[in-house]
């Protein structure tokens, strides 16, 4: 979708007020469909994210012979075929924009008896895949990439996999998950040790589906040959989507919002710690557990933020929230320093460069480094922002527009539907000044 046909005009609205139901967690939705498809029996998924990425994953499993019913937009009923019941696809498997889908599927499909090809959109086709194909090759998998290690992935079936003790050079939940899923089919035990703990959605959900798996922060181990038992999953609200409203309510004077039943996986919530370090007023109420995941209502009130040094230990736990954090830093008094975040350069866009360039366009001083940036808080001006088709960049600058002295035009926003369908409507409902222009 070209920037000229679909963009936002963001300008100051009102103080943000309301109680919000954020769409379901994308990471949990991907895994819920995958594991339900591999389980013995029928699983019901409630709170499923009806976004393009998760629809791509569900469509892939339909092509692999799994029957999936859709009683409502946020519900899926999955008729599992068992770990050995997937059928050979008759066409390529299109992951769309979903890096999670492609990397996890690489681990799963590497163990099947048939060949398959995983493709993605223009953005996903630029993303690095050797971090996944490397350890899978150590297990005996045969996966071919482009010469530069990017998709498409040609997965050769019929390989006998063996367990490995993998010491990952990168802190990536997707790499860990791909190895663990291949490990379900491998001879012997498979373990993953990480340089820093990452999100443990895969471990928690495999356990919910009856798999015996030992895991602690930074480590996971399972043995091959186990089966999955069907189970019903309630998907929590997506923290990464909630993040935009958490930041917006923190920086727009007079705001007070409640975000209901948000997933608070401890490996996901680094943004809360970072914002609290900057002086944010964020309360947690009604703690519960959904599908093995901790959830709570978040009560966010406006508070003046001050710049801070963001601890590197928080970086893996907020890697998707940095676009929102950069806007909080721009609104804060003083300097905010981010280091240890080189991973941001290989997301849907080079998010460090995109955020730095965009904030400079709006008059904010940003000193970029190879693995981070120093953001100098100040007054946010007007300008035209290129989101580079990155949904999180687009939503971050919609927040910036709420503090603008004029207006912020955010181009190329169609991809917001990959993770947060209906973001613009929900934002308008709580008080954002936000208009959608052009054609979808």
Swiss-Prot record:
Catalyzes the transfer of the enolpyruvyl moiety of phosphoenolpyruvate (PEP) to the 5-hydroxyl of shikimate-3-phosphate (S3P) to produce enolpyruvyl shikimate-3-phosphate and inorganic phosphate. GO terms for molecular function: 3-phosphoshikimate 1-carboxyvinyltransferase activity. InterPro entries: Enolpyruvate_Tfrase_dom, Enolpyruvate_Tfrase_sf, EPSP_synthase, EPSP_synthase_CS, RNA3'P_cycl/enolpyr_Trfase_a/b. Keywords: Amino-acid biosynthesis, Aromatic amino acid biosynthesis, Cytoplasm, Transferase. PANTHER family: AROM/DEHYDROQUINATE SYNTHASE, PENTAFUNCTIONAL AROM POLYPEPTIDE. Pathway: Metabolic intermediate biosynthesis; chorismate biosynthesis; chorismate from D-erythrose 4-phosphate and phosphoenolpyruvate: step 6/7. The active site is at residue 320. Belongs to the EPSP synthase family. 3-phosphoshikimate binds at residues 26-27, 31, 172, 174, 320, 347. Its main location: cytoplasm. SUPFAM superfamilies: EPT/RTPC-like. It catalyses: 3-phosphoshikimate + phosphoenolpyruvate = 5-O-(1-carboxyvinyl)-3-phosphoshikimate + phosphate. One of its GO terms (biological process) is chorismate biosynthetic process. Its EC number is 2.5.1.19. Monomer. GO terms for cellular component: cytoplasm. Pfam families: EPSP_synthase (PF00275). The keyword Glycoprotein does not apply. This is 3-phosphoshikimate 1-carboxyvinyltransferase. It is an enzyme of class 2 (transferase). It is found in: Cytoplasm. Phosphoenolpyruvate binds at residues 26, 99, 127, 174, 351, 392. NCBIfam families: aroA (TIGR01356).
């Amino acid at each position: 979708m070209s920037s000229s046909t679909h963009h936002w005009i963001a300008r100051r609205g009102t103080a943000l007020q309301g109680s919000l139901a954020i769409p379901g967690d994308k990471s949990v939705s991907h895994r819920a469909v995958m594991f339900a498809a591999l389980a013995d029996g029928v699983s019901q998924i409630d709170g499923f994210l009806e976004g393009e990425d998760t629809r791509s994953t569900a469509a892939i499993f339909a092509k692999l012979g799994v029957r999936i019913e859709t009683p409502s937009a946020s519900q899926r009923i999955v008729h599992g075929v068992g770990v050995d019941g997937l059928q050979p696809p008759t066409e390529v498997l299109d992951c769309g924009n979903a890096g999670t889908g492609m990397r996890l599927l690489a681990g799963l499909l590497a163990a099947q008896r048939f060949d398959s090809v995983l493709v993605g959109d223009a953005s996903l086709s630029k993303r690095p895949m050797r971090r996944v194909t490397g350890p899978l090759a150590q297990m005996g998998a045969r996966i071919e990439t482009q010469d530069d290690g990017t998709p498409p992935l040609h997965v050769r079936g019929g390989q006998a996999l063996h367990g490995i003790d993998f010491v990952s050079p990168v802190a990536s939940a997707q790499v860990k998950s791909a190895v663990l899923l291949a490990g379900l089919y491998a001879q012997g035990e498979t373990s993953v040790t990480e340089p820093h703990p990452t999100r443990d959605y895969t471990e928690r959900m495999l356990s919910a589906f009856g798999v015996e798996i030992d895991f602690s922060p930074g480590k996971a181990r399972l043995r091959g040959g186990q089966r999955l038992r069907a189970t019903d999953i309630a998907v929590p609200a997506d923290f990464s989507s909630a993040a935009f409203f958490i930041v917006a309510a923190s920086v727009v004077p007079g705001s007070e919002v409640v975000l209901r039943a948000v997933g608070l996986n401890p490996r996901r919530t680094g943004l809360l710690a970072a914002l609290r370090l900057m002086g944010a007023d964020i309360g947690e109420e009604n703690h519960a557990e959904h599908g093995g995941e901790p959830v709570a209502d978040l009560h966010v009130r406006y508070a003046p933020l001050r710049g801070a040094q963001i601890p590197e230990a928080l970086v893996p736990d907020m890697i998707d929230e940095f676009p929102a954090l950069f806007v909080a830093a721009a609104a804060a008094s003083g300097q905010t320093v981010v280091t240890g975040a080189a991973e941001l350069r290989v997301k849907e866009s080079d998010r460090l460069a995109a955020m730095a360039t965009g904030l400079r366009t709006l008059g904010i001083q940003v000193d970029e480094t190879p693995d981070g940036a120093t953001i100098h808080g100040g007054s946010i001006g007007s300008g035209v922002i290129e989101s580079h088709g990155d949904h999180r960049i687009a939503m971050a600058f919609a927040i910036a527009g709420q503090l603008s002295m004029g207006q912020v035009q955010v181009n190329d926003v169609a991809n917001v539907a990959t993770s947060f369908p209906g973001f613009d409507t929900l934002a308008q409902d709580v008080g954002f000044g936000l208009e959608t222009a052009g054609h979808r």
